[in-house]
Amino acid sequence: LEWAKMDRGSMTEEEAAASMCSRLPECLHEQAHLLVDRWDRPILPVPGMAELVRKLKEAGYGVYLLSNASYRQHEYWPRVPGSECFDGTLISADVKLVKPCAEIYELLYSTFGLIPGECLFIDDSAPNIESAERTGMPGIVFHGDADELRSEMKAFGVKV
């Protein structure tokens, strides 16, 4: 509940922690605050993904991030290996829209001047891919393996 609201940009982290604490026994309040304050710490880079992103960029492809995330994404993102290769980012909290709603994909296209049929969307959620495809952007469901993704991208004509 709180996470979805933070991703939509309709709740701050402080409000989320307070909301969680209102439903938890006092002995768990500190853990609720830690969860909200440190959500990004256990996230580890996918092996091979930074290299793949760099190769895409070197090959001349545009690389963009469309993420369902809270405002904290702006702090976290620069620490992600390969993030420097991205041409643009669109964070759900900033635009008050979340995947899989079609409007967020349309906003991605208009913000960065993208043509959906010339893009390839990669996401770990099948409903997000299906929604992107309904707006004209083909996609691949990412299962956590960069080498597998590279092979799947070749089927779409991506050369890396």
Label every PLM stretch briefly.
Residues 67:
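Conserved phosphate-coupling serine/threonine residues in phosphotransfer and NTP-handling enzymes
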Residues 14, 28-64, 102, 147:
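Short, acidic loop-to-helix structural element flanking the phosphoryl-transfer center
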